[in-house]
């Protein structure tokens, strides 16, 4: 990528802001090495990584990188046999811990969101090795302050125990010296000199006190003397300390060797964690600047919607909407300086650099960007967003360098093209340069204040004029980009509002040609027309948004109604189920009492009639529920013949079938109307009459007794619903008659009646077993039932 373009578009400042989002110096190093990619597939992959990181941040948070430092040099030293210090070993343990935490974080994320797909991040995290043994070994041996702990080895524990014992003996002896020779001492304290216990003795008692002098005070009045009584014990302490140091050195060497043995894995861990920190920083920066993922295309098409320059504060920035590379390949922004033209160029250039670096861009949805091999920018030397200090020479030197490289895969940005020289020559040069760049197929955006270029967009195919809006009332620019409208100088209007006399302004107008005045007038009208159009567009968008919100509110209300309906149905079903269970228990109680009376031989006719009446009263809801459940399970939709009389249950009217439609519905003539009705909303008139007659009969089912232990029910030619009602009554009477086995003849046919009978029997608690008939019993056209 062109170095000058990176400089003038302030790419380094972008990297500084991005580096602030990293959690480690390693992540910041990745940011500092970041460069825009020039390959389309590579840019796609970079954006995919940012998208996955954004998803992770949205669902949970950033990865836990605590303790991540660059330990690669320490690992290399360990590999060649060097002994690492305790702080260096702790840094290694921290890196291992960080990797383990990131892996655990990713695993929990997938557990919480089983359908989540993060292929790019997962492939990187899979490379991290947990290295639990390394981490545990270091933590077991070294505490958080970097001290080797007693638990590091049995030998170290024993040596330190010996040290504590010896130090206790020395202190005990010195305490005696402090008591017995207190007048010789400058102070009654014990101090350490050269790792030996000493006491402060006055200079004049040097000979009387004895012992070994190790130090003296700055004034020389006090000597720090090791009492003779503790010399031997101090020697033992020194020997023990030497052994302690040797054991600590051995432990550190052992841990360092362990680190060196997994050097490759540790380096991979560091590299992966650093890259993850860098990727997550992109997601966090995008969140900070309210960025969106842009669409990516391969046709060098730029579409910015409400784009904002990321360095300008939100309360100051004015979003721009601009398209380049579709209908128009060149954009020429005209008008006076200080109107925001340079900011527009920098916004286009910097957002293109951002997307090619895998960053989201601060813009609205539907923003679209492409991938360019090179971006060239001539925005002057040392120019900031607020200033333009370039000269003609510096401009032209840069342009000459650019022109030797520009091709159809380039994005070119010219600021104040042709400025700094004679206006006529400068304008002519600007037009020639724009024509040449356009001829090469590059995408170009240029700014100029030359009025000669106002007509350029109208005279060249693929070129569009634009200008920065200026508020004449407030005498200040609005920084809004107006596409399709060339810029005006507004010099006369501004001068008039500032108080210049009308006759002076009129004289100035006379100096300007009629054609130039006409052009300015035309531009003014274009600006007004565009503002009216934009105002109308905003109103339409607001109305559209209102309609969308109303529709969403309507859909929410519909969903609430549907949910309420389902809750009511669920409660009703629960209530019906309880009623069925209650009826079942009542029926069982009646049957049990009848059996007890029959077995006792004490049943009388009027008692039997009364018990049967109770059974019939308890039965209907249970019977209806059983039939409904079996009907639902068999999925047996009623079939109607053409001309058959039916009842439309939805509005309780009779009619007759005209025909059946391809979607399964029936066309029914009801009075003077023809209606299309679902089969489930139709009932046979004969069936309704039959049902009403059945209710009036209490014992209409006939049981043919074949022997003392069998009975038979013939259901051939009967519809499923009617047959199940008969079977229900038949079962009750069979139980009252104390039958042990019964037969139900349902025939073969379509199998619907057989399936219905099987479903009914599976839900009946009085049935011990049931099976299809065997050879000589009627085969599959008969069901044999044994009762409990």
UniProtKB/Swiss-Prot annotation:
Protein name listed in UniProt: Endonuclease MutS2
Region entry Disordered, spans: 688-708
One GO term of the biological process aspect: mismatch repair
Taxonomic source organism: Exiguobacterium sibiricum (strain DSM 17290 / CCUG 55495 / CIP 109462 / JCM 13490 / 255-15)
Protein purpose: Endonuclease that is involved in the suppression of homologous recombination and thus may have a key role in the control of bacterial genetic diversity. Acts as a ribosome collision sensor, splitting the ribosome into its 2 subunits. Detects stalled/collided 70S ribosomes which it binds and splits by an ATP-hydrolysis driven conformational change. Acts upstream of the ribosome quality control system (RQC), a ribosome-associated complex that mediates the extraction of incompletely synthesized nascent chains from stalled ribosomes and their subsequent degradation. Probably generates substrates for RQC.
Sorted UniProt keywords: ATP-binding, DNA-binding, Endonuclease, Hydrolase, Nuclease, Nucleotide-binding, RNA-binding, rRNA-binding
Similarity section: Belongs to the DNA mismatch repair MutS family. MutS2 subfamily.
Domain spans labelled Smr: 713-788
Record lineage: Bacteria, Bacillati, Bacillota, Bacilli, Bacillales
UniProt feature, compositional bias: Polar residues: 699-708
EC number: 3.1.-.-, 3.6.4.-
Gene Ontology molecular function, alphabetical: ATP binding; ATP hydrolysis activity; ATP-dependent DNA damage sensor activity; endonuclease activity; mismatched DNA binding; ribosomal large subunit binding; rRNA binding
């Amino acid at each position: 990528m062109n170095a000058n373009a990176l400089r003038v578009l302030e790419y380094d400042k972008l990297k500084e802001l991005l580096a602030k989002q990293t959690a480690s110096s390693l992540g910041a190093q990745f940011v500092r090495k970041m460069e825009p990619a020039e390959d389309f597939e590579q840019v796609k992959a970079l954006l995919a990584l940012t998208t996955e990181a954004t998803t992770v941040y949205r669902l949970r948070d950033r990865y836990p990188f605590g303790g991540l430092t660059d330990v690669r040099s320490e690992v290399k030293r360990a590999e060649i046999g060097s002994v690492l210090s305790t702080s260096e070993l702790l840094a290694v343990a921290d890196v291992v811990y960080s990797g383990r935490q990131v892996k655990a974080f990713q695993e929990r994320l997938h557990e919480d969101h089983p359908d989540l797909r993060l292929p790019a991040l997962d492939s990187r995290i899979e490379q991290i090795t947990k290295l639990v043994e390394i981490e545990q070994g270091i933590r077991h041996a070294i505490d958080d302050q970097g001290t080797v702990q007693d638990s590091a080895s049995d030998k170290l524990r024993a040596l330190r125990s010996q040290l504590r014992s010896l130090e206790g003996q020395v202190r005990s002896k010195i305490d005696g010296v402090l008591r017995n020779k207190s007048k010789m001492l400058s102070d009654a304290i014990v101090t350490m000199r050269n790792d030996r216990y000493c006491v402060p003795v006055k200079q004049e008692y040097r000979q009387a006190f004895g012992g070994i002098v190790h130090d003296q005070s700055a004034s020389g009045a006090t000597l720090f003397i090791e009492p003779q009584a503790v010399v031997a014990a101090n020697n033992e302490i020194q020997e023990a300390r030497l052994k302690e140091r040797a054991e600590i050195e051995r432990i550190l060497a052992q841990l360092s060797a362990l680190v060196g043995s997994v050097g490759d894995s540790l380096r991979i861990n560091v590299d992966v964690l650093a890259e993850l920190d860098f990727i997550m920083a992109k997601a966090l920066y995008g969140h900070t600047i309210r960025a969106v993922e842009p669409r990516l295309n391969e046709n060098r098409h730029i579409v910015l919607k409400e784009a904002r320059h990321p360095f300008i504060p939100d309360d100051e920035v004015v979003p721009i909407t601009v398209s380049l590379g579709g209908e128009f390949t060149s954009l020429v922004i005209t008008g006076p300086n200080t109107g925001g033209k340079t900011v527009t160029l920098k916004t286009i250039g910097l957002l293109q650099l951002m997307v090619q670096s895998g960053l989201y861009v601060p813009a609205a949805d539907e923003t679209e960007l492409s991938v360019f091999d090179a971006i060239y920018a001539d925005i002057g030397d040392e120019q900031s967003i607020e200033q333009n200090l370039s000269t003609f020479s510096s401009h032209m030197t840069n342009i000459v360098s650019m022109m030797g490289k520009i091709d159809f895969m380039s994005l070119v940005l010219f600021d104040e093209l042709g400025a700094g020289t004679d206006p006529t020559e400068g304008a002519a040069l600007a037009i020639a340069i724009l024509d040449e760049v356009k001829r090469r197929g590059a995408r170009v955006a240029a700014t100029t204040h030359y009025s000669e270029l106002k007509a350029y967009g109208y005279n060249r195919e693929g070129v569009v004029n634009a200008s920065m809006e200026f508020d004449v009332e407030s005498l200040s620019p609005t920084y809004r980009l107006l596409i399709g409208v060339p810029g005006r100088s507004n010099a006369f209007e501004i001068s008039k509002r500032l108080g210049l006399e009308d006759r002076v302004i009129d004289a100035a107008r006379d100096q300007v040609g009629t054609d130039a005045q006409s052009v300015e007038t035309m531009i003014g009208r274009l600006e007004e027309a565009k503002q009216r159009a934009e105002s109308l567009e905003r109103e339409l968008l607001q109305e559209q948004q209102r309609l969308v919100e109303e529709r969403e509110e309507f859909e929410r209300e519909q969903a609430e109604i549907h949910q309420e309906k389902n809750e009511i149905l669920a409660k009703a079903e629960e209530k019906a189920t309880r009623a069925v269970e209650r009826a079942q228990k009542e029926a069982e109680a009646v049957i049990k009492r009848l059996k007890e009376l029959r077995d006792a031989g004490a049943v009388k006719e009027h008692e039997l009639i009364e018990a049967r009446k109770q059974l019939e009263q308890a039965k209907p809801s249970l019977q209806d529920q059983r039939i409904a459940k079996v009907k639902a399970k068999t999925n047996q939709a009623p079939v109607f013949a053409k001309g058959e009389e039916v009842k439309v249950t939805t509005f309780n009217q009779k009619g007759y079938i005209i025909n059946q439609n391809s979607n399964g519905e029936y066309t029914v003539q009801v009075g003077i109307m023809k209606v299309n009705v679902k089969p489930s909303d139709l009932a046979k008139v004969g069936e309704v009459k039959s049902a009403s007659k059945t209710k009036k009969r209490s014992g209409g089912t006939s049981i043919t007794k074949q022997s003392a232990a069998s009975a038979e029910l013939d259901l051939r030619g009967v519809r499923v619903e009617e047959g199940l009602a008969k079977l229900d009554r038949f079962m009750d009477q069979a139980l009252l008659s104390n039958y042990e086995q019964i037969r139900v003849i349902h025939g073969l046919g379509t199998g619907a009646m057989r399936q219905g009978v099987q479903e009914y029997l599976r839900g009946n608690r009085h049935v011990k077993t049931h099976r299809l008939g065997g050879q000589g019993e009627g085969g599959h056209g008969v069901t044999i039932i044994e009762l409990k």
